[in-house]
Each structure stands twice: as structure tokens, then as C-alpha cells.
């Protein structure tokens, strides 16, 4: 920014491990925000902050879709061109399975994008969408890292080159699992949010609750066997993370179905 009052300098620049296009370093922040650019909360500042945070998390799939699509295209092309014992790599069954995992990630991310487009507009108040926002941010970034790892595996020795897309994608996707809330924390918050709603509705069975929850009522039936158990109080945090992962996948599958 050319205005000295709004300029944020970088006093120390770090050597990035990845994401080379983004400057990474120490920024002392001492700025004056113009009156017409300030955010004025209708009630508490907490609600305004949550609205901004959830909107940011809901828009993660837009980044993830292009990332996963590029990895899917590159990996598919490589497996078609690479010849092993006289046959393309893609003819190997385990390779087909790995490619299908990237394709599944792309499908799930596409469903997330459709939901986000309908939901994350500036005209909507997103302060109450913590479960859905955490689901999109955590799962799509996990899918990005998983797709990158698969692409690196399929690329073989070439993937270990510093300038190869597979190796770079592993490093570049990793920070997104950590910042804006580490994914383990977000999965735990998803589980905590659902258990709180279950107590409020006096429902003990996870499947019964998700069958009536707005963003899982269509998809829960596909996972009845896995979800048909009761959630009691005092769940260890490590188990909350696991339950949150399960719930995130059920909710995301509904976005695909819709």
C-alpha cells in the first residue's frame, strides 16, 4: 500500500520451505484503518469474527479443486505414458486404485464447491456454520495432501526432483492443514459441536442424529453400519478427532449427492 499509515513492512524474510510465490517473514503491524473501511458489528465482535472466519474456511474448496485437478491430470498422463514391462503403468490394478483415490478427492471437492458457492456469499451470515466450515477446510486440505502423496508415489524417482510438480505439491499443500486451525483441532470441534447438538435434542445415537441433521440427512443412510452407536459423555480428545473425521466425510458426501 502506498499510504504510509496503511503499509505493513516485512522486517525479516524467511526462506520458504514451499509456496514460493508468497512472501514469508515477520511483519510488525501498526496501521490506521480508514473510517469507511472499518467493519462495524451488528451485535458483538465475536459474531463478526466468526462470520469472517467461516467464510474464509468455506472458500477453501475453490483452491483445492484446481490443485487436485492438476494433480489428477498430471498423474493420469504420467501413468498412460510410462511403460513398465511393455505395458502402460495405468494397466496395473494398484495404480488404477491410487488414481481412483485422486478422482474421488476431485469429486468430493467439486461437491464442496457447489455448496460453498450457494452458501458463502457476503449476503449470508455464516457465524453459525462452524461445523460445515470446519468440515470443508479440514477435509479438503487433507484431500489435497493425500492426492499430492499419491501423485508423488506414482511419479517414482522423478517426483523427488525439486522442480517436479508432485514433490512441490506435497510441500505446498502441507501448510494448509496447519494454519487457520490445525485439522486435528477442527475435527475435534466438529465432533464437539455435534455432541452438543445431540445433547440439546436429547439424542444419544449418532446415526439417528445425523439422519435428521440438515447437511447429512441424505448421506447418513449410506454409513448406517459405521454410525450406529451412542455417544456418551467424557470422550477422549483423540476419539473426538476420529469421530470428527467420520462426520466430516458424511457431510461432504451429502454435498456430492446434492
Where are these regions (language model features)?
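Extended amphipathic alpha-helical segments enriched in small hydrophobics
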Residues: 57-123, 219-257
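FAD-binding core of flavoproteins
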Residues: 1-60, 198-238, 242-245
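Glycine-rich phosphate/cofactor-binding loops in nucleotide/flavin-utilizing enzymes
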Residues: 157-225, 235-236
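A conserved active-site cap/scaffold subdomain adjacent to cofactor or substrate pockets
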Residues: 54, 61-65, 76, 105, ...
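Short beta-alpha connecting loops at secondary-structure transitions
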Residues: 97, 128-135, 171-178
Amino acid at each position: 500500500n502506498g499510504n504510509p499509515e496503511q503499509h505493513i513492512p516485512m522486517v525479516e524474510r524467511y526462506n520458504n520451505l514451499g509456496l514460493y510465490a508468497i512472501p514469508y517473514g515477520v511483519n510488525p503491524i501498526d496501521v490506521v484503518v480508514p473510517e469507511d473501511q472499518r467493519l462495524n458489528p451488528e451485535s458483538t465482535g465475536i459474531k463478526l469474527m466468526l462470520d469472517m472466519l467461516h467464510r474464509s474456511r468455506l472458500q477453501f474448496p475453490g483452491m483445492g479443486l484446481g490443485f487436485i485437478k492438476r494433480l489428477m491430470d498430471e498423474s493420469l498422463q504420467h501413468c498412460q505414458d510410462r511403460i513398465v514391462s511393455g505395458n502402460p503403468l495405468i494397466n496395473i490394478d494398484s495404480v488404477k486404485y491410487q488414481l481412483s483415490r485422486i478422482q474421488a478427492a476431485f469429486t468430493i471437492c467439486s461437491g464442496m464447491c457447489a455448496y460453498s458457492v450457494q452458501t458463502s456469499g457476503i449476503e449470508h451470515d455464516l457465524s453459525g456454520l462452524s461445523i460445515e466450515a470446519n468440515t470443508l477446510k479440514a477435509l479438503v486440505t487433507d484431500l489435497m495432501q493425500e492426492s499430492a502423496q499419491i501423485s508423488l508415489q506414482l511419479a517414482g524417482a522423478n517426483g523427488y526432483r525439486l522442480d517436479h510438480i508432485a514433490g512441490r505439491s506435497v510441500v505446498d499443500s502441507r501448510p494448509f492443514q496447519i494454519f487457520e486451525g490445525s485439522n486435528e483441532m477442527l475435527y475435534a470441534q466438529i465432533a464437539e459441536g455435534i455432541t452438543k447438538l445431540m445433547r440439546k435434542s436429547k439424542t444419544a445415537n449418532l446415526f439417528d442424529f445425523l439422519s435428521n441433521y440438515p447437511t447429512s440427512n441424505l448421506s447418513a443412510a449410506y454409513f448406517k453400519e459405521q454410525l450406529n452407536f451412542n455417544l456418551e459423555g467424557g470422550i477422549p480428545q483423540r476419539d473426538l478427532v476420529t469421530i470428527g473425521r467420520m462426520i466430516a466425510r458424511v457431510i461432504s458426501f451429502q454435498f456430492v449427492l446434492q
